[in-house]
Amino acid sequence: MNTSITARELFEQQRERLGLRWAAGKSGEKRELEAGNTVSRRPSLAGYLNAIYPNKVQILGTEELSWLDALEPRQRWETIEKIMQSHPLALVLTRNQACPEDLRAAADESGTPLWLSPKRGHELLNHLSYHLARTLAPRVILHGVFMEIYSIGVLITGEAGSGKSELALELLSRGHRLVADDAPEFTQIAPDVLDGTCPELLQDLLEVRGLGVLNVREMFGDTAVKKNKYLRLIVHLTKPMTEPTPHGYERLTGDSGTRHVLDLDVPLITLPVMPGRNLAVLTEAATRLHILRTKGIDPAAMFIARHSNLLERRTP
């Protein structure tokens, strides 16, 4: 998914938190920053004024304005022009400093958003850097039901009619929590972290065939829903094999693997759907098994080691 943010959106999202006010350049409120640009050019998303390697949001504190004031008039104007030509998403003056008239005029002329804030520079830098990094992070929507099971994020996937929603309903009745049904959105907020959330349209809702759309919060209470969760495991429901295969299902280690999501390989466990199988119990067991494996405990490997040792002892 391509992600972007406009100057107007950033202003509205951070206006209350940072006390932002427009000073000039309001005609540039539709100026846009796309995630693709941050990858190809690799600028800093937010930082103190830098005319050589410009940040996408330039912060001007007292030192930056003092530096501008120390320049000769011609050099000062050339520097301001260069700043505007770098096409920043916005300029922000800290501590509600008085905006220099030449800077205001250049912002209006070039359509560069210029804001004032009562916050100190480091506060602006921390908030804006985090917010922009989060907003522009790579994201993808996956089909399935995303739940919190035993405190870890588990995505239940499978073909239509495989019983994902019914399984989710059973897990809810067993005390686990729903994050999103049908279309959870995952954002890579760190090199090894996928954060899953629910689209606003689908919040608190679970669709079950024969019952329609259920409001999980109303049926099971506030504790049955979760705003977000990191994705740690995918449980895939599949139809049983109708024809024998050379290997069949792996009896010792189970059908385990990984699924590539954005830049991460997420652990995957496949569960065959068959009459009489308690999928809720199996999913809970799969989650517990994953937790054990993350701690370095692998029951299958332990059994194989025991078996090998036994054979070695009995071999003359």
From Swiss-Prot:
Mg(2+) binds at S165, E207. It holds the Pfam family Hpr_kinase_N. SUPFAM superfamilies: HprK N-terminal domain-like, PEP carboxykinase-like. GO terms for biological process: regulation of carbohydrate metabolic process. Its EC number is 2.7.11.-, 2.7.4.-. GO terms for molecular function: ATP binding; magnesium ion binding; phosphorelay sensor kinase activity; protein serine/threonine kinase activity; protein serine/threonine/tyrosine kinase activity. The gene is hprK. This is HPr kinase/phosphorylase. ATP binds at G158, E159, A160, G161, S162, G163, K164, S165. It comes from Stenotrophomonas maltophilia (strain K279a).
